[in-house]
Structures are given as C-alpha cells and as structure tokens.
C-alpha cells in the first residue's frame, strides 16, 4: 500500500518563485531516493494559505530506505544548507500516512 509524506509551508511574501525552484530541486533529489510521485498543492482555504509538498512512496519499506539514505546524500545536505540560510518558506506542519485507496 502506498504511503504519503506531506509538509505544509507558509511561503514568505515575494518568495513564491524561489520556493518553486527549491521544490523542483528537492524533487529531483527525492526521486533518486525512491519517491514515486511528488505533488505541490496550493491551498486557498483553511487556517492560512499554504503550499503542501507531498511525496508518494510505493510502500512503507521504500519510505524507510528514503529516510535512512537522505542524511547521507551530499547533494541533499548542500541543498538544505543553502535553503536554510535564507528560507523562502516556514514549515507549518508535516504528516505521514497510508493511502487507503491505493
């Protein structure tokens, strides 16, 4: 059964373009580590407008391997250092669960 990991982001004013570039860069790295599909959802309603980055994995085992391998990827470590130095967004929440319709 597929599993989904989401991160909701509050994008800083004037930084949407930068955030989108960062999402595309992160997606390239994430796909190399087993992510099957990636979605970026722009919410228009709710407590505040957010962009939610969703990673879809074929199963929990693949997600576990992803979590184990990411900290050792030098490109990911470099990307995170650069993105964290001048953030384009603030993390609002994260979630992880099974896709009951897969």
Stretches with model-predicted labels:
Residues 4, 8, 33-52, 77-102:
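Glycine-rich beta-strand-turn "strand-cap" elements at beta-sheet edges
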Residues 7, 19, 53, 63:
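Hydrophobic pocket/interface hotspot
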Residues 15-40, 70-75, 79-83:
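Short amphipathic alpha-helical segments
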Residues 17, 61-63, 102:
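Residue-level signal for secondary-structure boundary sites
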Residues 47, 56-75:
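Glyoxalase I/VOC metalloenzyme domain signal
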